[in-house]
Design a protein with these regions (language model features):
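Double-stranded beta-helix
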Residues: 1-18, 116-175, 239, 273-305
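Conserved short histidine dyad/triad with adjacent acidic residue
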Residues: 46-80, 202-227, 233
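Short acidic (Asp/Glu) patches
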Residues: 53-57, 92-93, 109-113, 210-214, ...
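Short intrinsically disordered coil segments
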Residues: 62-63, 87-90, 143-149, 219-220, ...
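A short beta-strand-loop-beta hairpin characteristic of the jelly-roll/cupin
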Residues: 73-100, 138-141, 232-258, 297
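Conserved metal-binding segment of the jelly-roll/cupin
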Residues: 96-119, 253-276
Length: 305
């Protein structure tokens, strides 16, 4: 039997395929997960840096998708993680939601959302979209009237308070072997404890220096699919990770120094994750699909004996 080459699951360079002609933000956005990149993953993930007040503003208008979606706005201040560096007004179901903190927004399939308007800008920050179940780029992003401006603002047509889908402040995971080694607690921004309708676990945090001990994450497995993102913190060079790491997947060492996404099918052993070099802070984000609770996600997984 031929051995698996797990390199096929590691996205070292993104596709630049969506968006354009928008000042003040990275456009096109960086696609780090799709069926074009990893056939059969049925996920779509893109991200981009916001450098200034976008122009035009808004440039994303009311639209909907046939898939559940999670939108993250992530502050890049490693000393004040929850400070977004801007103020955004995001319409969901015709209801305006305003925030100036790092947030996660869960949008069930079929719910209209947009426009998205930046009201203030103080520091660069990241916008990330995760589409669950999307089989193609078109299904994951280009949907409805996303780029078409309409007269007036959307009106609310139901009695749902869409605030319930917005995570303004994270649950904090600390006191574990992993968080102690990272010198930084993990911030949980999506789980069924936070959003009961969600069946996805997401935590993330900026890595402030070499973990100690290193590697902080041993080899382990999950009963769920996972995507691990490591995102560089330089908005002027977003593909540069600011570190060199070795990630063992199925006992195959994969070394990288760029922003990456790694898709991990359920049951595939992965780890340890070892830092070889460290230059500046970068973001570590595990996304575990189908694991709604912290207990199900088991951030360190089931250790392999």
């Amino acid at each position: 039997m031929a051995e698996n080459n797990y390199e096929k699951y590691l996205i070292r360079r993104p596709m630049y395929e969506v968006g354009g002609k928008v000042k003040g933000r990275q456009a096109p956005t960086m696609t780090y997960m799709s069926n074009d990149l990893v056939p059969g993953c049925n996920l779509y993930i893109d991200l981009s840096w916001i450098y200034a007040l976008p122009e035009p503003n808004p440039h994303v208008f009311e639209h909907s998708h046939n898939y559940d979606k999670i939108v993250l706005h992530i502050g890049a201040d490693t000393e004040n993680f929850e400070d977004l560096g801007g103020e955004i007004e995001y319409y969901v179901g015709g209801q305006p939601l305003a925030f100036d903190t790092t947030t996660a927004l869960y949008i069930p399939k079929g719910i209209k959302h947009g426009p998205i308007t930046w009201k203030k800008f103080t520091k660069p920050h990241i916008e990330m979209s995760i589409m669950l179940g999307a089989e193609s780029t078109e299904g994951g992003w280009v949907s409805g009237d996303i780029g078409r401006q309409k007269e007036g603002l959307p009106g609310k047509k139901d009695d749902i308070d869409y605030e319930k889908y917005l995570v303004r402040h994270p649950a904090i995971l600390e006191g574990t072997d992993v968080t102690e080694a990272m010198k930084s607690p993990a911030k949980i921004y999506m789980s069924s404890d936070l959003i009961p309708e969600s069946n996805v676990y997401i935590d993330f945090g900026w890595i402030p220096g070499f973990p100690d001990p290193n590697p902080p994450i041993p080899d382990h497995v999950h009963d769920y699919e996972e995507v691990v993102l490591l995102i560089g913190g330089d908005p002027n060079n977003p593909e540069d990770l600011g570190a060199e790491l070795e990630f063992c997947v199925g006992d195959q060492p994969l070394t990288f120094d760029t922003t990456v996404a790694c898709y991990l099918p359920k049951g595939i052993k992965h780890g340890p994750l070892t830092w070889k070099k460290y230059d500046r802070p970068h973001l570590l984000m595990p996304i575990i699909i189908g694991a709604g609770t912290l207990a199900q996600a088991a951030p360190a997984g089931q250790k392999v004996e």
